[in-house]
Every structure is written in structure tokens, then in C-alpha cells.
Amino acid sequence: MSGYILAIDQGTTSTRSMLFDRNMRVVGLGQQEFTQHFPSSGWVEHDAEEIWKSVQSTIRIALAQAGISAADVAAIGITNQRETTVVWDRISGKPVHRAIVWQDRRTAQFCDELKRRNLEPLFTEKTGLLLDPYFSGTKLAWLLNHVPGLRERAQKGQVCFGTIDSWLIYKLTGGKAHVTDATNASRTLIYHIGENRWDDELLDILGIPAAMLPEVKDCAADFGMTDPALFGVSIPILGVAGDQQAAVIGNACFEPGMMKSTYGTGCFALLNTGTDRVTSSNRLLTTIAYRLDGVTTYALEGSIFIAGAAVQWLRDEMGFISVASEVSALAEKADPNQRIYLVPAFTGLGAPYWDAEARGAIFGLTRGTGRAEFARAALESVAYQTFDLLEAMQGDWKGATNHTVLRVDGGMVASDWTMQRLADILNAPVDRPVFLETTVLGAAWLAASRAGIWPDRKGFSERWQRDCRFEPAMPEKERESAIAGWRDSVSRCLTRPQ
């Protein structure tokens, strides 16, 4: 049986390759971690060649596990860590520097300089993003300013810039394709999301030559054919999306007003706003959710820095649990009469506060506070931060209502207790899918639908399966009191008034 779909999920700490059959069942999986480099405080880098090797390795593992050959694969879909920046030689394919990862903060001072020049409104108007080191544009500017001779080579078209998807497509096609998709382009700080083009004015401000930029395609498109020297056959690459946008697709959030939230180390929530390119007044990001058949669908995005990382903190630094899976059972034992708040601003606060200098704190401690109360506070902090995002989205866009259903994925959502508390605090239903690997599923659907093997959007949405719906059950007075306590706690951690 042919018609298998290969989905590559290139993440921040590991690479996974997953094979799906025609019935959307997983038949093979390869996973491999790779090295994290920290050359200086606040700097994070990856070896792009090591990432490429991990992709090749995991593909071979997945094929072997499935017991099929590459000739049985009908199409490839790719999803990737967003914003991470690679520059490589157009002829040799060799990177000129290690990839600068999305977490890297080396361009913070440069971003501050641009803000002092009052340029943030211009960048936000065109890209939907904020002037922050998080995004690719200032990382690329740093490389052009610090790698000897790179600017001249870029002006001559001798080097290529790309996010990880672009780098992998270049390598998979044997250097024949220098392309990206609209979702990854929308995270670079140099792409006009309203006009769907690289923006000359922003390129000029950052000093980036247009000759080094990839062609931007729809998320489901012909991105090129794999080099037959790699796997013995040429396989079409037909789908690409950044990881959070791929999760929107994998959760079948195709209608305006649908929202997904991914809970891993941090949390990323995206709200589908349809063709409305909403400008946030609450410092949320406006981004491209996906572009299909030439039609751009937008989203509001909010990011939380600390979600599952709060549980890791309880385990690794506090020693309250030995494994992360213990935390829910421990939280259930907490004294309901104690109201403890953990504001997990270990690395500042993300949306909608964007306070990099804020630091974590715990409020409400009594002599009776113990491990169980800490566990509950850590899990509740995720719910409260998600509430902050949803409230900001409702303030920005009329389509976000109290009837919004949140579809969730990521490691934390396996906990029934956490999901119920999330529904209670949001006062909104929370849907957990049967298949939790929605990011890689989204990449697979893009490729499979383009190949005509899997159903279209409507058919895929109908096949999306819910494992459980968590309905809000907390009395309104209790909920309002809990949220008031959270707001008071956050206000004490902020370094500037909101």
C-alpha cells in the first residue's frame, strides 16, 4: 500500500519524523535530540548541519519502523521551530554561522535602539509583531554585521537566509529550492502580512539585502522534490507551516473564533480571526494562521513563557515531586481553603504584559502551606495566564466571545485536573483531542490534502476527534474572587504600570 505521508517536526530540542497511512494513523516514528549551544549569557544557538543530520536519521528510523520504503511515500510535510535564523552559502550549502535560536536575546539592545527611534509602530503595522529579539529580522541583521564579508556576499546573492523550514527544504532538494511558507515568513519581522510580500522599507531599516530572501508560498504548495540521492526516489514536499500554526491546522481550527492553546514548556495560544487582520491594543501578536489557495487567514497570538516549566521547577529546584506526572494528584490534595498564587515570572512575563524585568513570586503563604498547595498554585498559574490571553483577545476582536471553545494540545493536557481548572478559570469549554500530536498532524494534513490523499478542510474537521470536553463548573463568585487575587498578585510583580 502506497500513499504514506511523511511529516517532519523539527523542534527546539529534538527532531521527529512521523509516517501516517491513508487513514491518518501513525505507522512509524523516529525521534532524535540535538545539541543546544549557549556561547554567552542569553545566547542560544543550534548547529544547522546537526539538525539536517537528525532529519535524515529520523526519516530512516520511521521508514524502518513502518516497514516501508521511500518509494511508498506520496508526500512530505514540514513543521518547525519558528524564528530560528540560518544563513548558508548558496552554492556549497554550508552555514556561515550557527543558527540563532528564537530564544536568543543578543539583539535586545538593538531592538531598544529601534524603539527609541519610534519605529515599533511601523513594524507592528506591517508585520503584526513587536520589536523583540524573539523574531528573525534582528537576528539576521546581527549576522550581517558580525560575520566578516557576509553583507557583501548577501548583496551579490551568494548566500541564502531562511528559517529552519527553508534550510531543510534546501537540503532535501539538493540545493534546488530556496523557499518558505507564509506562516514562517510572517515571523521574520520583515514580511508585510497584509500585502504578502517582503517589505522593502523594513529591509532597508535593518540593512538586509533582498537577494538573500526565499520565495514565499502557500502552506500547501509545491515546495520542490527531494534529491533522489537521499532516499533513492524523489518525493514531493507539499506542506509547510511553523509549529504553532501547524497546531492550529492539526486542531482543525479553520473557522473564525476557534482557538487552540499548546501547553509545553511555555504556552502558545492562537485565535483564528479569519480574513480580519486585527491590530491588537493589548500587545498580542497579529500573525498569519495559514495561507491556502492564495487566501490568507489571520490569528491573534499570545505566548506564555512558563507553563510546564513551572512543574519542572517544582521537581528540579524545589524537590516537591520526583516526576512531573505526580503533580496533578498532589494538587488535588491541596487545602481548598488556602488560596496560594504562584506568578511564574522566572524569565519575565509574556503576553499581554511583556515585562522582561518582572520576577516570580508566591503570595498567600501560611503556616499550613505545603507541597500540595504549591502544586495546585503551579497548575493554576497556567490557567490564570491563559485567562489573561483570552481576555486580551476578547478586548481586541469582537469574534472572541464567552462562547469560545479552547482546543488544547501539548504534554500538560493529559492532566484531567489541570484541564478542568482551566475550564473553570476561563469559564469556557476546553476540548482535548484524541490525537495530541496536533503539530505534526497539521503538517501531514497540508501535504496529504495537497496530494489528494486525505480529505479537504471540511472532511478533516469532521474527522477531528474529541477525547474529552471539560465544562466550567466553578461558582461565579468563587471564580471572580480567584481572578481578583491573581490580578493583585501579578500587579505586585510588574516593574512598570500597565
From Swiss-Prot:
Its EC number is 2.7.1.30. The keyword Membrane does not apply. The keyword Isomerase does not apply. It comes from the Bacteria. It is an enzyme of class 2 (transferase). Glycerol binds at R82, E83, Y134, D243, Q244. Inhibited by fructose 1,6-bisphosphate (FBP). Keywords: ATP-binding, Glycerol metabolism, Kinase, Nucleotide-binding, Transferase. It holds the Pfam family FGGY_N. ATP binds at T12, T13, S14, T265, G308, Q312, G411. InterPro entries: ATPase_NBD (IPR043129), Carb_kinase_FGGY (IPR000577), Carb_kinase_FGGY_CS (IPR018483), FGGY_C (IPR018485), FGGY_N (IPR018484), Glycerol_kin (IPR005999). Sn-glycerol 3-phosphate binds at T12, R82, E83, Y134, D243. It catalyses: glycerol + ATP = sn-glycerol 3-phosphate + ADP + H(+). One of its GO terms (molecular function) is glycerol kinase activity. PANTHER family: GLYCEROL KINASE, SUGAR KINASE. Belongs to the FGGY kinase family. NCBIfam families: glycerol_kin, PRK00047.1. Key enzyme in the regulation of glycerol uptake and metabolism. Catalyzes the phosphorylation of glycerol to yield sn-glycerol 3-phosphate. This is Glycerol kinase. The gene is glpK.
